[in-house]
Amino acid sequence: MRAPEFQSNTTTSTGCDVCLDPQKSFANLFKRTVILLSGPTGSGKTDVSLRLASMVDGEIISVDSMQVYRGMDIGTAKVSLEDRQRIPHYLIDICHVQELFNAVDFYYQAMHACQNILSRNKVPILVGGSGFYFHTFLSGPPGGPPADREFRDQLALYIQDHGLSFLYENLCQKDPEYARTITKNDKNKIVRALEIIHLTGRKVSEHSWSMEPQESREYNCRGWFLSPPKELLLDNIQLRCQKMLEDNLIGEVRGLLEQGIRENSSASKAIGYREWIEFIDQGSPEEAYEAVKQKFITNTCQYTKKQRTWFKRYPVFRELPTLGLTAETLAGKIAEDYFLHG
């Protein structure tokens, strides 16, 4: 079974300017340039990316593990439909909230989107904060094939009839070494492991995949990481979380619960959703609202620290301080680099 078909939403250079390896320099002459743009949550990636796309005649590929899901709009700060109609976006709103979508699916769909964009002489701009997905794009997919929907549908029926524990026991028999590394309640990993075994005939524990930063073998990547001052970022996050609540984030969560978001452990554990799912499960007590709101803000702030740490490992991403600079100016700096080195 294949991953969902990519959709456009329309309704390696390592970051250094001089490469000391002549073989790499020669190889890069034949690579097409792709722009990578990341930054912590609340750093203004969306605004910069929209302006950048206009400057370089680009189209945007979302690198966000939750924006692939329809209905997860407010909590993921999804780009507006109006902006998506103006500038084509890919890998947004392509899955139902109960569907599993992983790094392998992302890799193949992002590559497909890049080829589509480049075939029309446009510039692919990968934008988002999911470090693991960026790693996958640069280094290749984790061991294993793309998702097989038919097989996953079969597993869903097994879960419905026999429970998740039945699948976990099955995994323990087929790959006890890997089964010991996950919990018996981790539906995503259990399903993915059985899927890999089914499609490849090999145990998950037999697959190897490096988490060391690597250059893209496919493209000449020019990467940027937006870096606002810590105090400013914390202020932005508080305002961002407050606006999400004013925009009816809790109502969005209620709707997603009705659509079965609990069936997707990744989506239901996403920041901005897990806190309010718990709040709703408790009966939405008014006295707990402020505490849950603060937890939402705190979890978001902690996540930005992890994002900074993750991206520091990747020399392809150059830090771009944002203090005192508008989105237009920041986009201009990236565009200038692209026209000089792309």
From Swiss-Prot:
Which Gene3D superfamilies has this protein been placed in?
1.10.20.140, P-loop containing nucleotide triphosphate hydrolases
Q: Name one GO molecular function term.
A: tRNA dimethylallyltransferase activity
Q: Give a yes or no for keyword rRNA-binding in this entry.
A: no
Q: What class of enzyme is it?
A: transferase
Q: Which PANTHER family match?
A: TRNA DIMETHYLALLYLTRANSFERASE
**Which InterPro entries does the entry mention?**
Dimethylallyltransferase, IPT, P-loop_NTPase
- Protein name per UniProt: tRNA dimethylallyltransferase
Q: Tell me the keywords, alphabetical order.
A: ATP-binding, Magnesium, Nucleotide-binding, Transferase, tRNA processing
Residue numbers spanned by region Interaction with substrate tRNA? 64-67
Organism, as annotated: Chlamydia caviae (strain ATCC VR-813 / DSM 19441 / 03DC25 / GPIC)
Q: Name one GO biological process term.
A: tRNA modification
**How does the annotation summarize its subunit structure?**
Monomer.
Q: Which reaction does it catalyse?
A: adenosine(37) in tRNA + dimethylallyl diphosphate = N(6)-dimethylallyladenosine(37) in tRNA + diphosphate
Q: Which cofactor does it need?
A: Mg(2+)
| Tagged with keyword Magnesium | yes
Record-annotated residues binding ATP? G39, P40, T41, G42, S43, G44, K45, T46
Which HAMAP family did the record assign?
Answer: IPP_trans (MF_00185)
* Binding sites annotated in the UniProt record for substrate: T41, G42, S43, G44, K45, T46
